[in-house]
Amino acid sequence: DDMISQIESLKIDVYEENIRRQRAELQYMKLQANPHFYINCLNVIHNLSMMGKNDLLQQMTTYLGNHLRYTMEGSALDTLEKEMDCVENYLRIQQLRFPDSIVCEMEVTQDVRSVLAPPLLIQTFAENTVKYQVTAGEITHIWIKVHRTEENPHVVEIEIRDDGEGYPQSVLDCLEKNQKIFDKRGEHFGIRNVSQRLWLLYHDAAKLICYNDKETGGACTKIYLPDDIVENKQK
C-alpha cells in the first residue's frame, strides 16, 4: 500500500511539474511575442513629444498603457472579446504611426466573444501586416472575422487577411515543414510563437493555416480552435 501511495504521489508530482513547465513556457513565449512593438511605441512617443503634439501623445500613452495591462495579466488564456479589444487598441497605436494608412474591418459574432484563446493570438498577425506591408501614404486593408464553423458549432474560426504582397514562399514552406520561419527579412518569431502556444494548449485540436489569398494576393491566416478548453489552464 505504501509503495502504491508513493507511486501515485510521484505521478501527481510529475503531472504538476509538467503543468508548471507548460505555464512557464506559455508565459515566456507570451512575453516574447512582440518586443519590437514596444520599441516602436517609444519612438512614436519621443517623436510626438518633440513635435509638441500633446493630444496625440496622451492618446498614445493611454493606448500603450491598455496594451501593457493586457499583456501583463499573466493568463495563458483570455476571452476573444478581450483579445479583439487588444487588437483594436493595437491598431489605434499603429494608426498614430501611419496616419490614413491602415483600414481594418472586424466581424465578430456575439456567440464567440466569451470563448477562451491565447492572448495576442490575433494581434500577432495584425502586427505582421503592419510590420511587412504597411507603408506611410499608402492604404493597407486588414479584415478580421471570428465565428463558429458551419461544420462544427464547437469550433471557432479566426480569419485574418490583408491586401499586401502576401507571405513569402519561404515562410509558407517553413510552416508546412514545421521549421523555424526565416526569410530575407529575418526570423518570423511571432508566427512560430503562435504555433507553439497552440500546440501546448490544444495539441491536435487546433489548426493554424497560412496562405496567400487568390483574389487580393495578400496574406491570409486561419486559426481553428475548440470552444471547450478546460478553464483551469487559464490560471
Residue ranges and their predicted role:
Residues 210-235:
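C-terminal end segment of the histidine kinase catalytic
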Residues 1-210, 218-220:
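Two-component histidine phosphotransfer core
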